[in-house]
Every structure is written in structure tokens, then in C-alpha cells.
Regions:
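Conserved histidines in hydrophobic membrane contexts and catalytic metal-binding motifs
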Residues: 1-356
Length: 356
């Protein structure tokens, strides 16, 4: 039995109230989140622009002298209580970097192929926008939780907006009156961008919310029960804690071995612990941002194990990360992400203008 016109109109009125007030309360922060996320599409290029001392003409080459000097810098950082890691050259950033997290961004020196340090200024660069986009510059837990909640609100607001205008989607696509009265012109801009870029808006909001969901959603009770009742795994021989990290073995042979073990042409970064060296594959050539890992002993460099993320849940999460971060994208697709992000930002800004 079909619903009566009065019922449908009441539903649209309720959706309009929800769309208006939730959009007003969360819209300003969401506009900032989308604006900084749009700029983050070119975060590496922004960092290059802010570090003109680093030449970008050389191809991404990883050499033994650069890795040897990087290992020295890394050990010096560890001696000061820091936890630096190595970011390996890639097609977008063809230099070796020794990075350390300062609470908001990863900063550190960049090394040339012969091992010398480029005299570049220390700056967060494009990572400032990336960090603001995901944490509002408010810390990993508090900021990520707030951004995740705002993402959920945006999904509700977008759904309510479609419920309001579902009967007029086609007119909203073809009717644009830039010289009409200002409220009408702003509404047309809001509706046009909202309808045209609605698929992108839902995709980018949903994937971003899922990525941050662990910040606010607890583990399912079934998983907790399974972990509690599953038989204990065989314990590995305990390793006595080291007073200080052991010296780092030659890294270039380990990187080449990791490429073979991970069946990849490039590795992206290297993490260090007092006992292990973890080399992660590059995910710039695949839609699934899963990053399988080859792990070696820090003491002598012998191979320990490979950690692959091939489960269905890991593949699903990797797909969400790949779609959101767009590291796989070509230069043209990256510009398409950027233009879509600008359009969504303009849509939110136009909607906010209607209130003032």
C-alpha cells in the first residue's frame, strides 16, 4: 500500500529539519576537514614546494651510501629516545628520508644518493593538512574520534539531503541561476555540486569513517569471546630486553631480499625495533593498501618471517584505505580527486551561506 501525500510531505519536512540543523552544527568543521583533505591529495608536492633545496630531477634510486648514512642518523635518534624510521624513495618523492613523529607530523632530513644530507628546512609541509584532516590537530585519539563522529553525521546529512530532493534530481542538474537572488543562486550551487558529486562524497566519507572506526567502536563481543576461549598459542622463546638497540646491519641487501620475498618491485618504508627490522612493500601500484611486511633480525640481518594481510577483513580494510588515500592513482586521477574534493567543499560552504 502506497503512502499518502501527507505522509510523504511530513517525511520530507523531517528530513529537511535534520539536513538543515545537523548540517549547520557540523558543517563548518566538515568544510575544514574536506578542504584540508583536498589539499592532502598533493601533500607530497606541497612538501616539495616548501623544500626547494631538494632537487627532484634524479630518478628514485636507493644506494648503499645513502642507507649507511641513514642508519647512522637513525641510531643517533634512537640514542636520544626517539623512534625514527626510513621512508624509501618513490616516484613522487625520489629521496631517502629519515623521519620522526613530533606529535603532529613526520619530519626529518632527506638524503641524496651519495649519502649527503640536503640542506633543506625542516617543515611539516603537506603533512600539516593531512594531520588536520584526520585529527583536527587535536591528537590521535581525541581528534580521530571527533572526525569519525563527524563523518557519521555527514552520512546522515547526505542521506537526508537526497531524501529531500530525490524527486527533483534532474532539474537540479540542469537549472543553474547564477544571476538570481543570492539565496537562490547559493541554493542552486549547493544542489548542483551535491547531485553531481554525490557518489564521490559518499565514497570518500564512508571510507574515511571506516578507516577511523576503530577509534570509537569496540571489538564485537564474538571476537572478544573467541580470543578469550581460544587455546593459547605456543609461546616463543623470550628475548631478553636490550639495554640499547643493537647496530643496524647493511640495509640494501635486506631491501633487495624483501622485494623478492614480497613479490614487489619497490619497498616503501623501514621500521626498527630493538630486535627486528620490518620492511614494508610499496602500495602505490595497487588499489589495496595492505602493505605486507618482511621481517629480519636486527642483530645479524637474517630473515625471520613474512607477514601478509590476505584475509577477507584485511583486504576489505585495504580497499577502503586505497580508495581514500588514492596512493595508487595516476597524476590525472589525482587531479580528479582534487577537483571532486573542491566541489564537495564548495557544496558545504554554499549550504552554510544559506544560513547567514
Amino acid at each position: 500500500m502506497s503512502s499518502s501525500p501527507n505522509t510523504r510531505e511530513t517525511f520530507r519536512l523531517h528530513m529537511g529539519w535534520l539536513h538543515s540543523w545537523l548540517g549547520l552544527l557540523a558543517g563548518l568543521v566538515l568544510t575544514c576537514i574536506f578542504a584540508t583533505g583536498t589539499l592532502s591529495v598533493f601533500d607530497t608536492e606541497i612538501t616539495h614546494w616548501m623544500q626547494p633545496e631538494i632537487p627532484l630531477t634524479a630518478p628514485p634510486t636507493l644506494t648503499a651510501p645513502a642507507l649507511t648514512h641513514a642508519a647512522v642518523l637513525l641510531q643517533n635518534g634512537e640514542a636520544k629516545g626517539a623512534f625514527p624510521f626510513l621512508l624509501l624513495p618513490s616516484r613522487r618523492d625520489p629521496v631517502l628520508r629519515v623521519l620522526n613523529y613530533n606529535g603532529h607530523a613526520f619530519i626529518g632530513p632527506a638524503l641524496a644518493a651519495d649519502g649527503h644530507i640536503f640542506p633543506a628546512r625542516q617543515t611539516a609541509g603537506g603533512q600539516f593538512f593531512f594531520n588536520f584532516h584526520f585529527t583536527l590537530y587535536s591528537g590521535v585519539f581525541v581528534g580521530s574520534t571527533l572526525v569519525c563522529l563527524l563523518g557519521l553525521l555527514l552520512l546522515v546529512v547526505a542521506g537526508a539531503g537526497i531524501a529531500i530532493h530525490i524527486k527533483a534530481l534532474w532539474p537540479n542538474l540542469v537549472v543553474v541561476r547564477p544571476f538570481a537572488a543570492k539565496p537562490r543562486a547559493w541554493l542552486d550551487a549547493h544542489l548542483l555540486t551535491g547531485v553531481l558529486f554525490f557518489p564521490f562524497l559518499i565514497m570518500i566519507t564512508y571510507t574515511g569513517t571506516v578507516i577511523l572506526a576503530r577509534a570509537i567502536f569496540p571489538t564485537h563481543p564474538f571476537v572478544q569471546h573467541y580470543v578469550a576461549t581460544s587455546p593459547p598459542k605456543k609461546s616463543k622463546p623470550s628475548v631478553a630486553p636490550l639495554a640499547k638497540p643493537s647496530p643496524i646491519p647493511p640495509l640494501l641487501p635486506l631491501v633487495e631480499q624483501a622485494k623478492t620475498l614480497l613479490h614487489t618491485s619497490d619497498c616503501r618504508f623501514i621500521l626498527f625495533s630493538p630486535t627486528e627490522i620490518q620492511i614494508f612493500e610499496n602500495d602505490e601500484d595497487t588499489l589495496f593498501a595492505n602493505k605486507s611486511t618482511a621481517i629480519f633480525s636486527r642483530a645479524d640481518g637474517h630473515f625471520l618471517r613474512v607477514e601478509e594481510k590476505n584475509s577477507a577483513s584485511a583486504q576489505a580494510r585495504g580497499l577502503m584505505q586505497g580508495l581514500h588515500f588514492a596512493r595508487f592513482s595516476s597524476f590525472l586521477l589525482r587531479w580528479l580527486y582534487f577537483a571532486s574534493g573542491l566541489a564537495c567543499t564548495a557544496m558545504m560552504a554554499a549550504g552554510l551561506v544559506l544560513f547567514f
